[in-house]
């Protein structure tokens, strides 16, 4: 019996050791590659030695060209940074254990690490870099309501990504402005234009910040209301004609420069992920809402563990796939190419990851 217990303990210790064998402290440099490693290759898990926090912090300040004039602010940001290192370690450990419990390959596990948000508290990031404002959901909308549920009516492929047919515009960065609602609305329109006209076009988010009379600019909004407002404005200008400023300005809409006009829009009550696949496949990328709490530190891989209770961020669902038998969604974010998988995120499918079934989706119909 003693030998049996000894073997069990040996197996437990071996497994725990395996989890922390993937120690890559020198990857604090981050983003040194213009693209993530092959998604099918084993992904090392970062573990930050908290005793080295000050070294990591100085490296972080240098890499992201940050400084603080006030010594108290420096100390505060350093303490926040240390808290985030601890959070990152926990996220890496929890996702590995979740993969183990699901009998999933360790290579698919999400990897978290230091990024440009690492000197900010989660609340600061959610306040300044998201912008899905659910309180506006009771506002009247011109968009048609549709329920997304039931079995798909067509056979769907195991993998589909609108990027493969050049129907998704490059990643953008909303900056320190709660304008995700504008970016996802414009991203949807850009993809709809590419699907209809086989051409990518860069459209203006700033027009929505300045001229939308229902949404709240950098204080948040909703994507279907953005579609409605663009319908009433007569369309949207290009980014070149109405460039992004990252803050609300006076409306300077010029109807002579309208580049894309909308015919209508839809607000979707999403209740089934398989039916959602069909919607993305037949309609194009769909704007959805998620809880961004657990994606702040995301670097790559398929996210298993994800907070689902407070929808606060709008993103664009552009496809799906399966890696090592793990089904996932592909999401386009608006936090720049230096976040995540070159600006994109993958989350596990069929588990309501990040609360993507908790509210609604939206899409536009263009001329």
UniProtKB/Swiss-Prot annotation:
The active site is at 180, 313, 333. One of its GO terms (biological process) is proteolysis. The gene is VCATH. This is Viral cathepsin. Its EC number is 3.4.22.50. Glycans are attached at residues 103, 135. It catalyses: Endopeptidase of broad specificity, hydrolyzing substrates of both cathepsin L and cathepsin B. The keyword Hydrolase applies. Disulfide bonds join 177-218, 211-251, 306-354. GO terms for molecular function: cysteine-type peptidase activity. The keyword Transferase does not apply. SMART domains: Inhibitor_I29, Pept_C1. Cysteine protease that plays an essential role in host liquefaction to facilitate horizontal transmission of the virus. May participate in the degradation of foreign protein expressed by the baculovirus system. Residues 26-156 form a propeptide. It holds the Pfam family Peptidase_C1.
